[in-house]
Structures are given as structure tokens and as C-alpha cells.
């Protein structure tokens, strides 16, 4: 991922140095397990632990000749520990024993950051949902005014989705926080299963029940799919804020700092650039998920077609989502909200948004629903097309007069009556 979208902690996990450090840790732990079994001398394991190191440039130099990254890594480490201990590094292992176990450890760390980010987003949504619990606004369906809701309910809806995202990410973490040290085709042909158990336990990983040369890639696909779904949540939130920030709507908008500029040409502009960035990056995440699905099918006990893909999508997807979550947390925390504009827009249609309330009242009073629907719709369309007053038309309708008084009609135009169950909904979240 480009530095512009990389936050330090997540970027460190996927740095080349950290990847090699993690691989060295796997090799070191494997040698310790082998020493416990009596397969290699304890002194050799001690030397590997104390002297094990590498030079990244040296690894690259060796790889130019070997064209094999793991062999180059093992050779470079061997130069630090000396020939006597070097012959015991990587004993009984295949490259992906080290690579996949290190990758599982790194993915676990990345998931931990993402889960923490999601929890922080949940908290800021919860705080702002409580703040705007009773703030009325128009609810829109198909982009058209529907019925009143509250801005707090909108925020609570997002909060509920983030709760599910946390559960999804925790499940994905469990799926990828695994390791395998079972040899060339997964049969432990030249290594004792104890080594796998020992290494995984030290790293906080779960040994896979069965593997080929590699950990199966449905696990990685699940993580990338989860990342894409979480990205979809952030996309949804950002897209809604963008709509609410439209000039003709302006019910909410991103924070705009005093020295911020919106356009190189138009000094008046206040653009939702952060939300636009979130929406754009969500597209990347969906593309990464598709690539992960393609990685699931490998030849026989393993081919290497997945490797080049994962070198891009795993760092990029986790780094991108980490950055997007940071942007979303900041956006919600500083979101500018305009309750007066919300109320003005709620009344924009002259009461059309209470048409269902009128219809329901008529049916409750004994009117046939289809007939009542036609009566109310007639006056609604006159409001839409001719600008006639909706309430006046209803009160003058002889059919409606049979069932409702003018006072009863007026009472139907109270938005707060339609929001009487807000407390019930919010109580589900402890708000």
C-alpha cells in the first residue's frame, strides 16, 4: 500500500523486516522444539536463539542467485549463527511451514488492530446516537421523502452493523490465526508433530488439523471477504453522509477546518472529500476479496500461484481498512449536524410524509383500505403536481369527512407521534 494510506502500526506488521523477523522466530522456535525432542543438540538451538539474525540486503543478494526467497533467508541466517548451528536451521521443514506460520501470526496481529479500530468506531457511534436520539429528520426511501425518523436512529443502525462487523472480524481472526509445520505435503514425513504444536503454542496460533504443503486458502478468502464486508459498512456510512451534505440537503457535513480548502478554483466549496475517499477505497477491498477467492483452488498438494497475489492483497487490504476505519472514526466524531435543517426538510413536502398516518386512521375508522388509499393519494398528487395544500384538500374531501374531523386530520401531522417507539429501539442498545 502507498505510504499516503499507511498507518504506522499496521504498516510495521507488513514491513519486510518484520516479516523476516517473524520467520526467524518460527525457525528459532522450531529448533528449540527439535532440541527438546533430542533431534538436534541443545547447544545448536541455543546458538540459533542467541545469534540468529539476518541482513535484508544480503537476503536479496542471495536470492538473485537462488531465485528462492526462503532458501535465501535461511542461508543468510546461517551466516550469522555459524556452520555448526546453521545445518540445523529449517531441519525437516518446507518453505511454507515457515512462511504460512509466520503469515498466520502476522494476520492475527493485523486482525487485532482492526478489531480494536471497530470497537472504537462502535463507541463513537454510540455516543453520537445518544446525542441525537430524539432529533427528527425525514427518512428517505428510493431517495424520496418517506416518513420521519431520527438522526440518532440512523447512527444506531450503523452502530448495530459495526457490532456485526466485530463478530465477523473475530471469526475471521480465528480462521487465519493458525500455523502448520507438517512438511512437504502435510504428512510430517521428516518432522515430529510436536514441533508444530510447540511453535504454534508459543505464537498463540492454532495448529491446523490437516494441511497439504500449505494452509488452505479458504481461510484467507474468509478474511478478505470479511474485510470487504466491513469496507461495505464504511462505504454505506460515508455515502449517506455525502448525500446529507448535498447543498440542497445540508443536514450534516464533514468537519471543515479553518484553513482547509475545498477547491483550487471555487473558494466557496466545502466538499465531502474524506467520505469520498472512504467510498473509493471500499472498491479496492471488494477487488481484493475477488482475488482471494481465485486463490482457493491450487494444484494438487500445492502450487505457488497464490503467493504473488497474497503479497499484494493481504498487506494492502488490512492497511487500507485500518486507514478507512481511522477516517470514519474521525468523521463521525467531528460530524457537523444541523437539526434545524433536518426539521425544515421534514416539512418540505407540506405534510405528504404523513399520508400513511391519514390512511391508517381512515381504515381504523371503518373506511375500505383501497378506497381510502385512492382518496389520500388524490390529494397527495395534487400537492406534488399543483402545489395544493395537502391538509386543506383532505379536510375538504367529502369522503374523508365521513370518517375524520379537521382536528383528527391536524393531529396526524405531528412527527413525534410517529417516533413514539424510539426509546424502545434505543433501549436494545442500552441507550
Where are the predicted features?
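Acidic, glycine-rich loop-and-beta core segments that form the ion-binding/anion-interacting portion
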Residues: 196-289
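A helix-coil-helix interface module used to build multimeric assemblies
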Residues: 1-182, 188, 192-198, 207, ...
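Conserved helix-loop functional segments at active or binding sites
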Residues: 131-134, 168-171, 175, 205-209, ...
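Generic, well-ordered alpha-helical scaffold segments in large soluble proteins
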Residues: 33, 76, 80, 110, ...
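Short, well-ordered beta-strand elements within core beta-sheets of diverse protein domains
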Residues: 153, 221-229, 357-365
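Glycine-rich cofactor/substrate-binding loops
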Residues: 1-22, 62-66, 266-431
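Short amphipathic alpha-helical segments with heptad-repeat character
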Residues: 108-115, 119, 126, 156-159, ...
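Conserved hydrophobic residue
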Residues: 40, 249-250, 368
Amino acid at each position: 500500500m502507498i505510504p499516503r494510506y499507511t498507518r504506522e502500526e499496521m504498516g510495521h506488521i507488513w514491513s519486510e523486516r518484520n516479516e523476516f523477523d517473524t520467520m526467524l522466530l518460527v525457525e528459532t522456535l522450531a529448533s528449540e522444539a527439535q532440541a527438546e525432542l533430542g533431534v538436534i543438540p541443545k547447544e545448536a538451538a541455543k546458538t540459533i536463539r542467541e545469534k540468529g539474525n539476518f541482513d535484508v540486503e544480503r537476503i536479496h543478494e542471495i536470492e538473485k542467485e537462488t531465485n528462492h526467497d526462503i532458501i535465501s533467508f535461511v542461508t543468510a541466517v546461517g551466516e550469522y549463527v555459524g556452520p555448526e548451528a546453521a545445518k540445523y536451521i529449517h531441519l525437516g521443514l518446507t518453505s511454507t511451514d515457515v512462511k504460512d506460520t509466520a503469515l498466520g501470526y502476522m494476520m492475527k496481529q493485523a486482525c487485532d488492530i482492526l478489531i480494536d479500530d471497530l470497537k472504537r468506531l462502535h463507541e463513537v457511534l454510540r455516543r453520537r446516537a445518544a446525542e441525537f436520539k430524539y432529533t427528527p429528520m425525514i427518512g428517505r426511501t428510493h431517495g424520496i421523502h418517506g416518513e420521519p425518523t431520527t438522526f440518532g436512529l440512523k447512527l444506531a443502525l450503523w452502530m448495530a452493523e459495526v457490532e456485526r462487523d466485530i463478530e465477523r472480524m473475530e471469526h475471521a481472526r480465528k480462521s487465519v490465526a493458525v500455523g502448520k509445520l507438517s512438511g512437504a505435503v502435510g504428512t510430517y514425513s521428516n518432522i515430529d508433530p510436536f514441533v508444530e504444536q510447540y511453535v504454534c503454542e508459543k505464537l498463540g496460533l492454532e495448529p491446523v488439523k490437516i494441511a497439504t504443503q500449505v494452509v488452505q486458502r479458504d481461510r484467507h478468502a474468509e478474511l478478505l471477504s470479511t474485510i470487504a464486508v466491513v469496507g461495505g459498512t464504511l462505504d454505506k456510512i460515508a455515502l449517506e453522509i455525502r448525500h446529507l451534505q448535498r447543498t440542497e440537503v445540508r443536514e450534516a457535513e464533514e468537519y471543515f477546518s479553518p484553513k482547509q480548502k475545498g477547491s483550487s478554483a471555487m473558494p466557496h466549496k466545502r466538499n465531502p472529500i474524506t467520505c469520498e475517499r472512504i467510498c473509493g477505497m471500499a472498491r479496492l477491498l471488494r477487488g481484493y476479496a475477488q482475488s482471494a477467492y481465485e486463490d482457493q483452488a491450487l494444484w494438487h498438494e500445492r502450487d505457488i500461484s497464490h503467493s504473488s497475489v497474497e503479497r499484494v492483497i493481504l498487506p494492502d487490504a488490512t492497511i487500507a481498512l485500518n486507514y478507512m476505519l481511522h477516517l470514519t472514526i474521525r468523521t463521525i466524531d467531528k460530524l457537523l449536524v444541523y437539526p434545524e435543517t433536518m426539521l425544515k426538510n421534514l416539512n418540505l413536502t407540506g405534510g405528504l410524509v404523513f399520508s400513511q398516518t391519514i390512511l391508517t386512521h381512515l381504515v381504523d375508522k371503518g373506511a375500505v383500505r383501497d378506497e381510502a388509499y385512492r382518496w389520500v393519494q388524490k390529494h397527495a398528487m395534487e400537492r406534488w403536481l399543483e402545489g395544493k395544500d395537502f391538509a386543506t384538500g383532505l379536510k375538504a374531501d367529502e369522503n374523508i369527512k365521513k370518517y375524520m374531523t379537521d382536528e383528527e386530520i391536524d393531529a396526524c401531522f405531528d412527527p413525534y407521534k410517529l417516533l413514539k417507539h424510539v426509546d424502545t429501539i434505543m433501549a436494545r442498545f442500552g441507550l
